[in-house]
Amino acid sequence: MGDKKSPTRPKRQPKPASDEGYWDCSVCTFRNSAEAFKCMMCDVRKGTSTRKPRPVSQLVAQQVTQQFVPPTQSKKEKKDRVEKDKSEKEAASKKNCHKKTRPRLKNVDRSSAQHLEVTVGDLTVIITDFKEKAKSAPASSAAGDQHSQGSCSSDSTERGVSRSSSPRGEASSLNGESH
């Protein structure tokens, strides 16, 4: 009786000898070279199991407590809060619907706008160039304050903010400095 073989179950085929230099990744099934310690596609270590890891008891307990937080407010207080939130959202949406606000930089002097038109083909783009605001100096350097208030344009050309087409040498000679 021990000599009978099950006809319904085929035997497992041995792997061909040509696969000796490779191993298949258990996650992405990529065929890696035998020298590779990690999968070249998904960086999973060689021999890593694809089984789901056991849940850590501390993590499970933490997730359970987060799921079942008991309600602390009464139904009446909750209802009042929901109505208040709705009225605030409606008021905010009414304010925003007729005025769109653009993000603005804080260190820009808006009164110093220069408009440049650039046309390429049939497309014209207007570039608005602003100068940087003069930074307020600390109270301890009174002499420095007087210098920075004397001439706004010379201050900006010294820092290289101006988009003048003149070279740096000419810009510094305009400030009263000689070389």
Swiss-Prot record:
Its main location: nucleus. In the mesoderm, expressed in the region close to the surface ectoderm. InterPro entries: RYBP/YAF2 (IPR039958), YAF2_RYBP (IPR033774), Znf_RanBP2 (IPR001876), Znf_RanBP2_sf (IPR036443). Residues 1-23, 47-117, 133-179 are annotated as: Disordered. GO terms for cellular component: cytosol; nucleoplasm; nucleus. Keywords: Metal-binding, Nucleus, Phosphoprotein, Transcription, Transcription regulation, Zinc, Zinc-finger. The modification Phosphoserine is found at S166. Residues 146-155 have a biased composition (Polar residues). Residues 62-73, 162-173 have a biased composition (Low complexity). A zinc finger (RanBP2-type) spans 19-48. It comes from the Eukaryota. One of its GO terms (biological process) is positive regulation of DNA-templated transcription. Residues 95-105 have a biased composition (Basic residues). GO terms for molecular function: transcription coactivator activity; transcription corepressor activity; zinc ion binding. It is found in: Nucleus. Residues 74-93 have a biased composition (Basic and acidic residues). Binds to MYC and inhibits MYC-mediated transactivation. Also binds to MYCN and enhances MYCN-dependent transcriptional activation. Increases calpain 2-mediated proteolysis of YY1 in vitro. Component of the E2F6.com-1 complex, a repressive complex that methylates 'Lys-9' of histone H3, suggesting that it is involved in chromatin-remodeling. Interacts with MYC, MYCN, RNF2/RING1B and YY1. Part of the E2F6.com-1 complex in G0 phase composed of E2F6, MGA, MAX, TFDP1, CBX3, BAT8, EUHMTASE1, RING1, RNF2, MBLR, L3MBTL2 and YAF2. PANTHER family: RYBP AND YAF2-RELATED, YY1-ASSOCIATED FACTOR 2. This is YY1-associated factor 2. The gene is Yaf2.
